[in-house]
A protein has these predicted regions:
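Short, Lys/Arg-rich flexible segments
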Residues: 1-153
């Protein structure tokens, strides 16, 4: 995947030099928004960038929860909203990611690190669930967006 991304980068660099800074910024924002939509759809489908499903949550002991058991909810329901998943695009780069406290939580899941579920709780190793990453469709989306901008230009 890294070689595909590097090949796309070298191919796009030559074409981007033809655009003015304002046009590059506009293109970066639009591609960034499309990438965010793609990441949101993938999180909603509970899939890693390689197409595998997220590892499900660990089973909890629900004794004593008489009548208060909530149905299973999808993971990262709020995290995938636009208020947490931010896009930044300028003439030289596109960034799709998280900020603040949500970034720390997302990092733990992205790399499968240890963290505390709540204050005072023991450290727990979380399963790796890649929230952000490039799929082949994302690379095609970038390529198509760049070509569309150049044909309009």
């Amino acid at each position: 995947m890294a070689s595909n991304l590097e090949a796309l980068e070298t191919w796009a660099a030559v074409l981007l030099d033809r655009l003015a800074l304002v046009e590059r910024s506009k293109l970066a924002r639009s591609i960034g928004q499309e990438l965010r939509r793609s990441q949101q759809k993938r999180m909603m489908a509970q899939e890693n960038p390689d197409g595998t499903k997220f590892v499900p949550r660990k089973q909890r002991n629900l004794r004593g929860k008489m009548g208060r058991i909530r149905r299973k909810l999808a993971m990262f329901r709020k995290v995938r909203t636009a208020s947490y998943l931010k896009v930044r695009g300028d003439s030289s780069s596109i960034t799709v990611g998280f900020t603040g406290r949500i970034a720390l939580i997302a990092r733990v899941h992205q790399f499968g690190l240890k963290d505390r579920a709540e204050r005072g709780a023991p450290d727990v190793r979380y399963e790796q669930r890649e929230l952000l990453g490039f799929t082949d469709a994302d690379l095609d989306l970038i390529r198509d967006g760049l070509l569309a901008q150049l044909t309009d230009h």
